[in-house]
Amino acid sequence: MEGGGGGGGGGGGGGGGGGGGGAPYATRTAEEVFRDLRGRRAGMIKALTTDVEKFYKLCDPEKENLCLYGYPNETWEVTLPAEEVPPEIPEPALGINFARDGMNEKDWLALVAVHSDSWLLSVAFYFGARFGFDREARRRLFNMINNLPTIFEVVTGAAKKQAKEKTPNSSSKSNKPSSKVQSKAESRSKSKLSAPKDEEGSGDDEGEEEEDDHDNTLCGTCGTNDGKDEFWICCDNCEKWYHGKCVKITPARAEHIKQYKCPDCTNKRARA
């Protein structure tokens, strides 16, 4: 087994691509499966970017069929595939090391990235099937995944280019709608996400930046920014925004809520 980036701690060795310390089998919701995928994705991105020299050396073409695994704890590992048939979870691309010396390094890394993206999707929807996700849960899971840049886009630099083209004027807090600071009433979770009408004399640049803010805001439950003209509500604890329909809050009900806490924050407090 070839370890990389502390990967052995993530899966427990021996081609344990499904391991990750047993974390996948504790998941039950689309959001939990997404967190599992996000951790695996982060580990694989490390292998192909910050840890690329180590990854390159581990992928010796003289060795047997090797795979790149990503684990939920954001580590990675280059190792042999799982021995059990069928495997515990879908396996990543086999033999990534064989093409290393026959290709330009950037092209080879991009090829591994494409296969890694494919593997992440197969693992995510394997868990979706295992946990009996219905159509709505599968849709939420796909939308959350689709809102992330692919590994291929990160490795090739396409993700940075897209981000610059999409939000040239946005700040680091652009995922929060500017309507949140308009008034105390709106900051207490009653603001719709639709962009406020510009006052007379307001600059065009300001309006464009505000529009970018709205476009980048994702619902904390379904992971999409669909329905910008619908009612949205903000958690006063974690400051995440949610579709009212996703958290079962109506505008009328919100009028009587002094301080709104989302389901995640409510559950955390109950467990504590």
UniProtKB/Swiss-Prot annotation:
Keyword annotations: Chromatin regulator, Metal-binding, Nucleus, Transcription, Transcription regulation, Zinc, Zinc-finger
Superkingdom field: Eukaryota
What are the residue positions of the site described as Histone H3K4me3 binding?
A: W232, D236, W241
Q: Cite the InterPro entries for this sequence.
A: Alfin (IPR045104), Alfin_N (IPR021998), PHD_AL_plant (IPR044104), Zinc_finger_PHD-type_CS (IPR019786), Znf_FYVE_PHD (IPR011011), Znf_PHD (IPR001965), Znf_PHD-finger (IPR019787), Znf_RING/FYVE/PHD (IPR013083)
Query: Which BP terms in the Gene Ontology apply to this protein?
Result: chromatin organization; regulation of DNA-templated transcription
Q: Where is the composition biased (Basic and acidic residues)?
A: 183-200
* Compositionally biased region (Gly residues): 1-23
UniProt keyword annotation of DNA damage present: no
Q: Where is the composition biased (Low complexity)?
A: 168-182
What is the protein name stated in its UniProt record?
PHD finger protein ALFIN-LIKE 6
Q: Which organism is it from?
A: Oryza sativa subsp. japonica (Rice)
